[in-house]
Amino acid sequence: MVKILLSMVIASLSASAYAYDIALTPLHGFAEQVDKPYGKNISLHGTPQQIVRLRKWISQIASVPKGLDTLIRIQSSGHKLFITHSAYSLVSSGRTAAPATSNLINGIGESVDISFNANIPDTGSHQVLSNGQQLIEYTAAQNLYHELAHALHMMNGTWRFFASERQAIEEENEFRRQLAKSQQRPFSERVHISGVPICPRASEVPDESWSQQLICRNHR
């Protein structure tokens, strides 16, 4: 889900006060960066365990050609990407934000913040609808890729102002298609509808390690 910061809020922040000035963890360790074609402009923020999980999901994303291409294009944008854990990312467990300037659509781009719930299980916190109107998986890696797709276009100035969610889902579906092929599984195309939380049954206790109860309550 995209959340563009209000212009009046951004105007009150100097460029040096944006999120990238706080203590961050690089996506790759120094030795790893030499061999990686992506990630030099990506920083993470969270507990050590959350950093491990974010790195794992990004590694899974990079193992798919579409995912690797997205990460390479994010690096070549020349802007910074900050990914932080947030237990309050309730709509599909992620949201992407950038300064609300014309650079988002004029080919220049902006630096971007992704807030993502790094505590969700690998299987994901939500499901999404296929074009056959069936609920299908929305794993943590697929969810994070969706946010990276938003970031890709914001950072390259190719963001569709009135159709940003459709744009990200188009990218996500190509990622899903390639992922399904690599896993030798059937491909299910996602439609342009927000995710549906995976909620506990009446007899089950909510899993508070990833704010399941809060996510489900917010959906009602």
Predicted regions and their residues:
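A metal-dependent hydrolase signature that marks the N-terminal structural subdomain at the beginning
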Residues: 18-98
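A mature extracytoplasmic/lumenal domain signature
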Residues: 28, 46, 87, 118-120, ...
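Active-site scaffold of zinc-dependent metalloenzymes
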Residues: 93-141, 151-154
